[in-house]
C-alpha cells in the first residue's frame, strides 16, 4: 500500500475504538455500568462487546493493509446493520431503550460501512497500481 501513515492511522483509531467498546460493554455487562446505562438492550450490548474483539482485529488488518482486514470490516458493517435492524424491531414493538443507543448504532453502522469501503478501495488501488 502506498499510504502506510494513513493505513496505520486508521488502524490505530479502529483498534482504540475496539478497546473502548470492550471497556464500555464490559462495564455494563460485568461491572457497575448497568445502573448508568439505564434501559439498555441486552442483545445490542452483548453484540457490541463481542464485536469489540473483532474491531481490534480489523484495526490490525486494516493497518497492515491486508485483504482480510477489509473483509472483516465489511462483515462488521453487515452484522452491525443486522443488529441495528433487530434493535429497530425491538423499539417499534414497544421495548425499552435509550435514545443514545440509536445514536451509537447509527455511528457504528456508518463507521464500519466507511471502513469497509476505505479498505476495499485501498486494496483495489494497490492491486492495479
Segments from the language model and where they lie:
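Topology signature of small-to-medium multi-pass alpha-helical membrane proteins
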Residues: 1-129
Amino acid at each position: 500500500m502506498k499510504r502506510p501513515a494513513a493505513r496505520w492511522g486508521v488502524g490505530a483509531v479502529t483498534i482504540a475504538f475496539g478497546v473502548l467498546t470492550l471497556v464500555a460493554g464490559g462495564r455494563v455487562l460485568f461491572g457497575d455500568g448497568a445502573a448508568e446505562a439505564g434501559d439498555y438492550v441486552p442483545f445490542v450490548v452483548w453484540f457490541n462487546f463481542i464485536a469489540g474483539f473483532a474491531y481490534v482485529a480489523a484495526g490490525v488488518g486494516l493497518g497492515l493493509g491486508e485483504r482480510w482486514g477489509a473483509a472483516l470490516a465489511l462483515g462488521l458493517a453487515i452484522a452491525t446493520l443486522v443488529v441495528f435492524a433487530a434493535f429497530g424491531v425491538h423499539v417499534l414493538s414497544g421495548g425499552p431503550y435509550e435514545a443514545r443507543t440509536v445514536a451509537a448504532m447509527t455511528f457504528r453502522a456508518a463507521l464500519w460501512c466507511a471502513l469497509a469501503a476505505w479498505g476495499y478501495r485501498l486494496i483495489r488501488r494497490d492491486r492495479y497500481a
